[in-house]
């Protein structure tokens, strides 16, 4: 048997952790038979090396402002080409709504690599849908990870025929999850008091109001421990939590492993949350985030209509409070948990891993003139879109020294990623030649 093939996963930084979580779940399933590498624009990539032993690199998104928009696709191209050359990768998998032109250019530069788009369904009908035919045609394969709410998908991807559909993908796997006692010990929770996990975003005014409304619905639950993954505060540091709650902010990755610690959950209706919490049979209230391309309301309606979760009206703060309050009823919690036991196991990670292994063994394809033309079209469409939309990004950094690191420590990586400096990460164990190339890339796009 030959050496295990390298498969690169590249993910965008969406709302939530769905893209990175899917890539990680598939990479875990691949690990016995392949060498997965994850490059991600999500800051949570800092957690992956120490949690799973998977090689990872942070890839700054265009919104960081570390180089101009016109150069960013070329920077992505050169980063991915260098990684392909270092690892002799056979497949490049992109998980995100928009397959950026830089990834397509990298495959065009290294045509021996097969390009796969991991394209989640349930798109909202927004302007991005018009690029779907062009984007899909630039791929060697399109794989659609299954969604419990697939029957309610009436978006633009639901009409397309090129995708290979699989079972849902999730970091939650029953065989790997800790039991209730172990989970509570790992999180430092009281073994005898009820606990609720609240995973809602904050930042924008409407998101802050939803957080407060949800927390208000937990008031009156005797001896309750309210568990959050970040402090419930607004941009000015003001608490969003009403008085009378025992709040505990935890840091644990992956949370999918310790969901048995909780009696109920309140979360956004993203792909990741639904396919972890419901797969774990956790009684859940869903509060949709309507930003972005993910049709969270369609997913929430399906879960509610068939009795798998409670859907709060995200536009009605009083309804959010009252719906969350229903979780205080033990009969309601028992009913939701019992119903979730009917859901199929999220085994899509293993399915996709097996498909990628077969793709890795396929002979290289020739990159056609039409594919190269599609790359140019997508690149200039993206630049024009950003100029028209004037999407907010951080102010460009022109004179800050670049920080290089090969650390796999989650705290160190997280600090560097969140800092105001340009941060270039090498995966641990990379060669001196690769590091020299990466320095050259940084000099080219950031300046010396």
Question: Where does each model-flagged region fall?
Answer:
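A short, glycine/small-residue-rich beta-strand->loop->alpha-helix junction that serves as a flexible
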Residues: 10-22, 205-207
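C-terminal amphipathic helix plus adjacent low-complexity
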Residues: 328-404, 410, 420-422, 426, ...
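Short N-terminal targeting/anchoring amphipathic segment
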Residues: 81-99
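Conserved nucleotide-sugar phosphate-binding/catalytic loop shared by glycosyltransferases and other
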Residues: 3-15, 29-79
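A nucleotide-sugar donor-handling region in carbohydrate enzymes
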Residues: 120, 124-127, 135-202
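Catalytic binding pocket for nucleotide-activated donors in carbohydrate/polymer assembly enzymes
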Residues: 273-321
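Acidic donor-binding loop of glycosyltransferase active sites
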Residues: 260-273, 282
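Donor-nucleotide binding loops and adjacent catalytic segments primarily
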Residues: 181-264
